[in-house]
Design a protein with these regions (language model features):
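Flexible metal-binding regulatory segments at protein termini and peripheral loops
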Residues: 1-124, 222, 231, 247-248, ...
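Conserved ATP-binding TGD loop and adjacent catalytic N/P-domain core of P-type ATPases
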Residues: 16, 430, 510-512, 544-546, ...
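Transmembrane helix-loop-helix hairpins at the membrane interface
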Residues: 85-239, 350, 715-720, 726, ...
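Membrane-embedded alpha-helical bundles of multi-pass transporters
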Residues: 109-123, 152, 156, 171, ...
Length: 845
């Protein structure tokens, strides 16, 4: 999507006009204009010259946004320059409005004294009012220039309504002044007094001043809606210390190149994304992720621009600079989202497109109607002017975008990034949340969970033997034991004669004693295991854990259980989702036994096990038949499923925010951000409904009241000045209501409402249904040597790499691989594929 700056827009009608003319340019497939940020996003093959020309022809100005230095210049582009200008206009207008109101209303209504030269000087009074009004009209000439220019281009906007209303009041008052002068010359005092009461100079001036007041309040409030985006842009560091030719030098952060070596002292901001070469420190990443707890960084870890080095000295290499940094990607994502439209905005857009012409028509009908009813020209004109100045298309046009902008800002502060307004709206409507297990519900890294020493063996003795043996292994489960040993500060000699028996276990010698470790089958070859120990191992396996047995000189030392543990916040997050009326499903490639154990611990409604990475998309498609689906994954192998879902949520993106497949990017690896994102979406949607209700209600009530429809019944009539006051406050109320979203606590469950749903989800075997569609032929392989889920994954990946294999269901517990074939394949090929991975195939049928 190519981005443009658009200037000259003053209201929702202008926005609708720009969208309409650009959408008609050949080659444009979609266009979205934001009145808040004065920007436009265009997709298609049309040239920028054609697009700019179309905007210019419509009476506005457009230019292609400069891509360079977007983060540093963006804050300046969003700076509120409009409010100071409007405030100056307002103050000067008030200075001249006060004497005008004194002359027109103070003397006539409350008999306040007049200057001597105006006593009994009716013409002088009229000329003074005309002079003050002209000055105020000149001060606020922008309304007339914009309004009548738009009218000439057949695209009337809010300024057109104001300009027409003020011009009508001023024009009729000027006519009355000249008519009064003629009457005074003729000595007709009665007619003079009659025309004196037909002056509406103060109405014209008051309309312009009150609308300027409203515009000032609106501009100030709109400026606040972009505070979050501006604060992000202001985070961009200005300077960097780099090492070039062996010399340290200070340069602009914009000049840092990929591969440069840069230094960061304690208390300084990191200028660009990089990788730590030397040093250790705690980094405050709150600005990017919303995480208040500093993150420890050491050699080999990634660091991001705009995060703060809190303690140690760091030497880093620049890996992503300029627009490629994490900060720039976040800014781009939030900006792009602000330039898109939510589906709910379509109603307001349609109304805004015809609103002003409709109001002008109603005003004309009102004037003619009252004249036909026998009322005076002044009375009829006052009703028509009231209709013009009370009508407000801006309230309609701002109802959705201001809420979207503020909502996006709240999300960004909390590390929740919505790519489009559509995703921000749709997230709150989901019925089903599908969670990928690994890296989403769990940490994605095996950890030691249980230590069960054998009788007479201390926990320390078991751990030291396991640590010494596993230090030599490259297996993922071995790494879990080694990490645990490091945490306990174990220092043991390296084993001799180390040997890894693929798929079974490990052997080695330490102090002339033989150490063995591995699965039950491997250990049982050399010693007998009691039934009690076997039952303990079975219980661990039932809980989704992998039991590792260790022995010394054929004497059992005990069991260490390893598992990909559930994140601390996962059960609570899932509980919150269910409390919101959302059905929670877990997808995993694990066997059903392990999957159910994890699912029960996490508290999900359903578990769909044995789902291949490329099978997730079909599962999401099937779930989509039952309701709106959000898919949550870590982005690894999840792209098709994230794309298929109504809302794709990438969790734990960290520095990699450019997740093309996802609609929502969560910067942290916390599942709690999923209900928070849905809560934010619901809050924004509720706020939009409030804004739209107010905008429609205001115009539905205000226009008939201004037209005088209640005069015959209740005698209520609206002075044009009060109509202008109401108009000036309407947009301000909408924007202020949207700003309340800044007070929304997206972590609190107090205001959660359970979504009403009648979805009957029978999902346990939904993956099997999908698989049966391609089930031409299966073969069952008996395999020895598999001892954990990682072994399963290795065999599965190897088999599924064969072009003839559609899918493979592998179980280390059963020692089998059920292979679904798309076409015939020789058993020898299947056997060799598995044995090349150091496992033994004992049969195929």
């Amino acid at each position: 999507m190519e981005q443009y700056n658009v200037t000259g827009m003053t209201c929702a009608a202008c926005q609708a006009r720009v969208e309409k003319v650009v959408s008609k340019v050949p080659g444009v497939t979609s266009v979205s204009v934001s009145l808040l940020t004065n920007s436009m996003g265009v997709e298609g093959t049309a040239t920028s010259a054609d697009i700019v020309a179309a905007v210019e022809k419509a009476g506005y100005h457009a230019s292609v946004k400069g891509a360079e230095k977007e983060s540093s210049q963006g804050a300046e582009a969003l700076a509120d320059t409009e409010t100071p200008k409007l405030l100056k206009r307002l103050i000067v207008s008030l200075i001249f409005l006060m004497p005008l109101m004194y002359l027109s209303m103070g003397h006539m209504m409350w008999n306040w004294p007049l200057p001597g030269f105006l006593n009994n000087n009716h013409v002088g009074m009229g000329l003074a009012q005309l002079l003050f009004t002209v000055i105020i009209m000149v001060i606020n000439q922008r309304f007339f220039i914009s309004g009548f220019t738009s009218l000439i281009h057949r695209a009337p906007n809010m300024d057109t309504l104001v300009a027409m209303g003020a011009t009508a009041a001023f024009g009729y008052s000027t006519y009355a002044l000249f008519a009064m002068t003629v009457a005074q010359t003729a000595g007709n005092d009665k007619l003079v007094m009659s025309y004196m009461h037909e002056f509406y100079f103060e109405s014209a001036a008051m309309i312009l001043t009150l609308i300027t007041l409203g515009k000032t309040l609106e501009a100030y409030s709109k400026g606040k809606t972009t505070d979050a985006l501006k604060s992000l842009m202001n985070l961009a560091p200005k300077m960097a210390t780099v090492v070039r030719n062996g010399q340290e030098m200070q340069i602009s952060a914009d000049q840092v190149k990929k591969g440069d070596i840069f230094l960061v002292k304690p208390g300084e901001s990191i200028p660009v994304d990089g990788i730590v070469l030397e040093g250790n420190s705690a980094i405050d990443e709150a600005a990017l992720t919303g995480e208040s707890i500093p993150v420890d960084k050491a050699e080999g870890d990634n660091v991001s621009a705009a995060t703060i080095n809190q303690s140690g000295f760091l030497k880093c290499e620049a890996t992503r600079v300029g627009e490629d940094t994490t900060l720039s990607q976040i800014i781009k994502m939030v900006s792009d989202a602000a330039a898109t439209k939510a589906p709910i905005a379509k109603i307001a857009d349609k109304v805004s497109g015809i609103f002003v012409p409709a109001v002008i028509t109603i005003a004309i009908i009102t004037i003619i109607g009252w004249l036909l009813a026998g009322q005076t020209v002044g009375f009829a004109l006052a009703r028509g002017i009231s209709v013009l100045v009370i009508s407000c298309p801006c309230a309609l046009g701002l109802a959705t975008p201001v809420a979207i902008m503020v909502g996006n800002g709240v999300g960004a502060k909390n590390g929740i990034l919505f790519k489009t307004a559509v995703s921000l709206e749709e997230a709150g409507k989901v019925d089903i949340v599908a969670l990928d297990k690994t890296g989403t519900i769990t940490n994605g890294q095996p950890k030691v969970t249980d230590i069960l020493p054998a009788d007479g063996i201390s926990e320390k003795e078991l751990l030291e033997a396991a640590f010494a043996l596993e230090k030599k292994s490259e297996h993922p489960l071995a790494k879990a034991v080694v990490e645990y040993g490091k945490e306990k500060n174990f220092t043991v000699p390296v084993v001799d004669d180390f040997q890894a028996v693929p798929g079974n276990g490990l052997t080695g010698t330490l102090n002339n004693k033989t150490l063995t470790g591995g699965n039950l089958l491997f250990i049982e070859k050399n010693l007998s295991i009691s039934e009690e120990i076997k039952r303990s191992a079975e219980q661990l396996a039932s809980a989704g854990k992998t039991p590792l047995f260790f022995a010394k000189d054929n004497h059992l030392l005990g069991i260490i259980a390893v598992a990909d543990v559930i994140k601390e916040d996962s059960p609570q997050a899932i509980k919150e989702l269910k409390a919101m009326g959302i059905h929670v499903v877990m997808l995993t490639g694990d066997n059903e036994r392990t999957a159910k154990a994890i699912g029960e611990q996490a508290g999900v409604d359903n578990v769909i096990a044995g789902v291949l990475p490329d099978g997730k998309e079909s599962v999401i498609r099937a779930l989509g038949e039952k309701g709106k689906v959000a898919m949550v994954g870590d982005g690894i192998n999840d792209a098709p499923a994230l794309t298929r879902a109504d809302v794709g949520i990438a969790i734990g993106a960290g520095t990699d925010v450019a997740m093309d497949a996802a609609d929502v990017v969560l910067m942290k690896s916390k599942l709690a951000d999923v209900p928070a994102a849905i809560r934010l979406s619901r809050g924004v949607l509720r706020n939009i409904h409030e804004n739209l209700f107010w905008a429609f209600f205001y115009n539905t009530i205000g226009i008939p009241l201004a037209a005088g429809l209640l005069i015959p019944v209740f005698g209520l009539k609206l002075n044009p000045m009060f109509g202008a006051a109401a108009m000036s406050l309407s947009s301000f109320c909408v924007v202020t209501n949207a700003l309340r979203l800044n007070l929304l606590n997206i972590r609190s469950t107090k205001k959660d409402k359970k979504k009403k749903t009648t979805i009957d989800v029978n999902l346990i075997n939904i993956n099997n249904k999908e698989k049966k569609e391609v089930n031409e032929m299966t073969k069952t392989m008996s395999i020895k040597g598999m001892m954990c889920g990682h072994c399963e994954a290795t065999v599965k990946k190897a088999l599924e790499a064969l072009p003839e294999v559609a899918s493979a269901e592998v179980s280390h517990e059963k020692g089998t691989a059920v292979v679904t074939l798309e076409k015939e394949i020789a058993d020898d090929v299947l056997k060799k594929t598995v044995e090349d991975k150091d496992y033994e195939v004992v049969g195929i049928k």
